[in-house]
């Protein structure tokens, strides 16, 4: 009698898109690219002491409701503009729950919050969200 001990807890195996595939499906806009480039330069200048503004990274623990998070981003973008002389505001965007051992694992792993672990959808939803935030002129990190 042969006893199977390998892969006994695997229910199915599905392919996951490569980063290049997701980027091709959801390309970055000129506005989002410029937001990213300018923010990286400004952060570098702050950290090296060439810019005396305070770098402020704010945002939710982890995103599960992209519509609510986009509303938050819109409000934060307005604050970013008003306070730009003194602060560089970056939205904290986190999609996973790294310290969670039970329950929901995060937007990328389980975007539908139903235990289906549709990572294909999760990866695309996360990228689309980041692109929308970048299009608001708000850097994300």
Model-identified regions with their sequence ranges:
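N- or domain-start disorder-to-order transition segments that initiate the globular core
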Residues: 8-50
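Catalytic cores of large soluble enzymes that bind and process phosphate-bearing ligands
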Residues: 14, 28-35, 64, 68, ...
